[in-house]
Each structure stands twice: as C-alpha cells, then as structure tokens.
Amino acid sequence: MVISGERAYIYAKICGIIGKSFVGKRVSALGGINRLAELDRIVFPNANRDLPERELLPDLERRTAEKIVREIIGIIKCFKEPPEFLILLIRAYEYADMKAVLSALADRETMSPSWTDIGEFRTVNFEAYPNIEKMLKGTEFEFLLKEDMTDTLSLQTKLDRRYYGAVWNAVLKLPRGDRKGIEKIIGDEISLRNAAWVLRLRTYYNMKPEKIKNMLIFIEGKKTFTDDSLEALNFALDVRSEWTKWKWAAFVREGNIGEYWKIDPRYFQNQASAFLYRSVYHSFKTRPFTLDSVFCFVRLKQSEEDVITSIAEGFGFNITARESLTLLGAI
C-alpha cells in the first residue's frame, strides 16, 4: 500500500493523542481514583478548579467534551478534503444536542440545554432557543417543523434513522481498502443499538412488538440491521434458554441455578459497548494509515469521554471508579 504524506502525518498525530488518552491499558490508571477532584486533576493536570463537587461535575463534563471535540476536529482538519464520513462523525454531537432540544421543548423549558460547539461543522443555531424555527432555518433538520413536537420518542427515532442512514451511505462511498473495519463496526453498532433498544422498551415500558418495530433504526438496502432485534421480540424475557442461539447471546446475563432470571438491558448494553470498544481498539492497531484508523481514533476518544463521565457521575451514587470501569467492561 502506497502511503501518502497526508495519511502518514495524520496517523502519527492520532497516535500521539491516543498515547496520552485514557484508552487501552491507560484506562486502568483511573481505577484507583476516589474523589471527583482527583479525577479532575488527572484528566486536566494543568487546571486548578477550586469548585464544590456539585459545580465541578458539570464543569468537568463540559471541559472533557470540549477537549475531545477539539482533538477530533483537529484531526479532521488535517485532511485537505475531509471525507463526508468523517464530518458526519463529528456531527453526531449536533444530532445528540438536537435530541436534548426536542426534550426540553416538549417539557416547555425556557432555558436552552447545554450543547457542544463543533465549530464550522455546526448547522443549528442553538443560540436562538426556544425559537425552533430560527434554530433550524436552512438546515437538514427543518423537516422537524412539520412534525408533532410533543412526540419526542418518535422524533428522536427519526433523527437516529436519518443520522445512521447518512453515515452508512457515506461509508459505502469510501474505497474498499479504507472501509474494511469501519463497515463491520458501524454495522455491529447499528445492530446492537437496535437490540438494546428492543430490550429496554420491552423490559421498562412493556411496549408491544408492533410499536417497537417503528422505533428501530432501519436502513434501506441489502442490510437493514434489524434482523437480530426483530428476533429478540419473540423471546421470553424471563426464560434464559430462549436466548442461547441468538446472535448476541454472549451479551445476555447468565443465570444461577435456582435463581429467578430476567433479561437485564443495562448488562446487555455494557457488554455490547465493551465488545464494540475491543473491535475499535483492534482495528486501530491493525489498520494503520487507513480511514479505518481515523474512524477508530474518533470512537476511542468518544469512549474516553464516556468513561470519564461515567466515573464522575458514579461518585454521586457512591460508586467507585473501579466499579464504574467494571460495569462498563473497561477493565
């Protein structure tokens, strides 16, 4: 494979960032932390935030997100012509922020929810909240203005479908040599999101199968990524043996003899996230100089954000850093 100077420079740059990030073996360094202030000092050694913990938590989460977004954008800007796929990765933050806006509007909140600044890649005028027409004018999100703004769950599903549909189509436009790992990981990610959603809706909301089907991320084409989740609609939630031959059975909690068993959506979600993390880390190590490695860099940084946030929020529930990492499957 002929490696361009641009690709070599970008790969060297992302390796330098990853080497200083809390991913891979460095995640375990967070396990011995006991206090939020200590976590803040490790993540931001040059910062001196003398804040009460209830103020430090949102402050730490905000700075963590801002730092990681800056690093991701810095890499994307290294491309003379960034692929559409990479731009969509950073715009995931905008989609997530739009979900928060829709929830806030449905609850008639007058103050805007916090949002992540993705710089030149941002399209929504979040400063105009709560004027939704002004916020969305000229953006791809204008279609929301014709929807029932009170049906938050349906709107969020439409956003998920729109986002992952755009991502998948952008992946298929990449050269085959660049997308080997991306295609597999994104496909698994969509499939697992659907599966986790089915488990949550069945377990926590007792939602009927026909309604659940309308809440899944369905992508037009040869691969719909709904087969596994549709199959899970038919399994009894309290019979472990019915799940044994399911594609994602390894992520379903085992039961003990004589113990009442029921599907655990949170356990499934954590196991699925750990599986995707391992896939991303392996691909990052084995696919240097490809867009695969850049994609994996983005996912590793986003995983780092999730880990830091989970540990920080866990302290508020008397959950230790090590316990949080164990729940996430990070150690």
Can you name each region flagged by the protein language model?
Residues 1-331:
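N-terminal domain-start signal
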